[in-house]
Amino acid sequence: MGAVQTCFLFVLVGLLCVESKYIKYDTSSVIVPGKINVHLVAHTHDDVGWLKTVDQYYVGSNNSIQGACVQNVLDSIVPALLADKNRKFIYVEQAFFQRWWRDQSEEVQNVVKQLVSSGQLELINGGMCMHDEAAPHYIDMIDQTTLGHQFIKEEFNVTPRIGWQIDPFGHSAVQAYLLGAEVGFDSFFFGRIDYQDRAKRKGDKSLEVVWRGSKSLGSSAQIFAGAFPQNYEPPINLYYEVNDDSPILQDNPSLFDYNVGERVKEFVSAAMDQANITRTNHVMWTMGTDFKYQYAHTWYKQMDKFIHYVNQDGRVNALYSTPSIYTDAKYATNESWPLKTDDFFPYADIVKCLLDWIFYE
Ligand SMILES: *[C@@H]1O[C@H](CO)[C@@H](O)[C@H](O)[C@H]1NC(C)=O
Ligand SMILES: *[C@@H]1O[C@H](CO)[C@@H](O)[C@H](O)[C@H]1NC(C)=O
Ligand SMILES: *[C@@H]1O[C@H](CO)[C@@H](O)[C@H](O)[C@H]1NC(C)=O
């Protein structure tokens, strides 16, 4: 045999030795009362105009400014959800969703209607955008919310249950009672509060509260509200967009870098850290961030594996969830919550303070 043939044989034997074994990942977990439940909430945060215009964001042009294409997100979510009925996704910004909806065939629209009615795809917040809560007049907040909700009601015959103002800089009591409780939301979640307030709330487990925003309406217009422990991002090392560098969960023992034990350990420890600052045995992880899920399979493939192996390990229980499922789970515990009145204003961010200090002092 010549060198070429020998080499070829080695490659062939090498390929045959990498056993490929089909694994059916068990993603069917539901809430387990006696354990820490990690609610994995798959989401994207799509600013309706920020570094690019709303049109550029939708079609994915001018990607040198920011690599962001919202129609890719919505296009890729549909097959990813159809591939496993346990997977879930939330979508927020109606300015993008309605644009995409108008571009779809009747067949796709019917599939999406089924995903919404089965609860796999949940439309939350439901306004055209995630409005700022400090500068706009409340009439405009009502109008832009109404416009989005009307469409959702007409097309899907559902009403969004959850307020999801994860990126506005600080939060107003008006948002809590008028654009939250009075809209009919069951809960309201957000990412940005003053960094000192957040630190204190982590210490005394008061990130989640009952928020009574109106003095005159009192408890008749209160709402369950939660600030996230960090931002609206996943825990460290759990980012799975195509170019993200979080370590993948490599579960084929015949390949290099098998790491199931290590990655499960990291997952469990992040869950316990968050449980330590949270009332009840339910914690929510926001699995996504700005303009993510442009290729949704990369996220779901990893989350499928985590759910499978973390639950096999058994120290905590991981599940595909939504903020509605999380809210119902919190409610079912009968926990009593700290009371919050007035605003989450003024807002200061520690990162920004540091940058100001470095560049302007
Ligand atoms: C966006 O892309 C278009 C087409 O390539 C180009 O003409 C325009 O200058 C770009 N805009 C910005 C702000 O870079
Ligand atoms: C849990 O919280 C307590 C008090 O807030 C803190 O002292 C402790 O280090 C935390 N433990 C873990 C594992 O995060
Ligand atoms: C919560 O309270 C309801 C009504 O009193 C009761 O049926 C239920 O068992 C309680 N749940 C827990 C987890 O204590």
What are these regions, as identified by a protein language model?
Residues 3-20:
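Cleavable N-terminal signal peptides of Sec/SRP-targeted secreted and luminal proteins
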